[in-house]
């Protein structure tokens, strides 16, 4: 029996509909490539991108190529009212970290810095205030770095511990050639990282812990932040799990020392 395509569109309209679908698909793919992939790479930069950064700026610490199960934990914006809780988590799990100190938060917390050093933690320089370091003049940034350096040195002297190599992490994480040159002249190594849960902006501690664990790789440098209530539960989740997976969680200096060939 013959079939009559009573509801079939004329061929001209079918071609037009097909072109419309193809165009819509093209727009979708373009949007994914233009917006979604770059956003995802910012949130979770792939290994090849971190490796490119390390080659492009070899004077900056991003990660350390190694097959050893070892990562550096770095914690910005210390000290705060949460620092001692963070210290307790690290001690309970046989872990250590490099804390990047904001000088404006130190007054009244000098004993906390001393305790951190005595417990095997490391202190890095994060300037005096929580602001983009790149926007400061050379003289202002130099003054801030040296002021924080004095505070850090006093903590090591009080703890009776030798001062380790000097690390600087710029406020907001951005740098340029001028900042890199200035930091080097002051005897510092610029330290960034490869695993960053964006915890200043994202307060969901379970999500942040999962982010860290999903990005975990030998030689990684984790960046997270003190001064937030959600950091403590995030580390309570992430640090024991890293240890369970066989990773050592150490300071920047220990990572560089133990992976040196």
Residue ranges and their predicted role:
Residues 174, 179-215, 247-258:
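His/Asp/Glu-enriched short active-site or ligand-binding loop at hydrolase and phosphoryl-transfer sites
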Residues 80-82, 130-132, 174-178, 198, ...:
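Active-site environment of divalent metal-dependent phosphoester hydrolases
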Residues 47-136, 140, 144-157, 163-165, ...:
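Active-site beta->alpha N-cap acidic-glycine motif
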Residues 138-143, 206, 229-232:
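Non-membrane alpha-helical structural segments and their capping/turn regions in soluble enzymes
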Residues 2-73, 79-92, 238-241, 245-261:
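N-terminal pre-catalytic segment of deacetylase/amide-hydrolase enzymes
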Residues 72, 98-100, 124, 169, ...:
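Structural detector of well-ordered beta-strand residues that form the stable sheet scaffold
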Residues 155-176, 180-183:
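Basic- and aromatic-lined ligand-binding clefts that recognize polyanionic substrates
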């Amino acid at each position: 029996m013959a079939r009559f395509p009573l509801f079939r569109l004329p061929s001209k309209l079918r071609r037009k509909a097909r072109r419309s679908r193809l165009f819509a698909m093209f727009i979708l793919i373009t949007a994914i490539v233009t917006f979604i992939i770059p956003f995802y790479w910012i949130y979770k930069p792939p290994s090849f991108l971190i490796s490119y950064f390390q080659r492009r700026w070899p004077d900056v610490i991003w990660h350390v190529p190694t097959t050893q199960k070892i990562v550096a934990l770095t914690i910005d914006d210390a000290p705060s009212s949460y620092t001692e809780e963070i210290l307790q988590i690290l001690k309970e799990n046989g872990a250590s970290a490099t804390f990047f100190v904001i000088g404006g938060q130190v007054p009244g917390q000098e004993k906390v810095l001393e305790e951190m050093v005595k417990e095997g933690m490391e202190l890095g320089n994060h300037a005096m205030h929580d602001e983009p370091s790149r926007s400061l003049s050379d003289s202002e940034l130099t003054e801030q770095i040296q002021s924080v350096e004095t505070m850090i040195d006093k903590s090591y002297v009080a703890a009776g511990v030798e001062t380790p190599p000097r690390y600087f992490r710029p406020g907001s994480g951005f740098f340029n050639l001028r900042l890199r040159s200035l930091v080097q002249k002051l005897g510092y190594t610029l330290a960034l990282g490869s695993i960053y849960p964006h915890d200043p902006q994202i307060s969901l501690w379970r999500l942040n812990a999962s982010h860290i664990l999903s990005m975990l790789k030998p030689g990684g440098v984790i960046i997270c932040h003190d001064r937030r209530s959600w950091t403590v539960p995030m580390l309570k989740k992430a640090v024991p799990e890293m240890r369970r997976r066989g990773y050592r969680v150490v300071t920047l200096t220990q990572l560089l020392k133990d992976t040196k060939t």
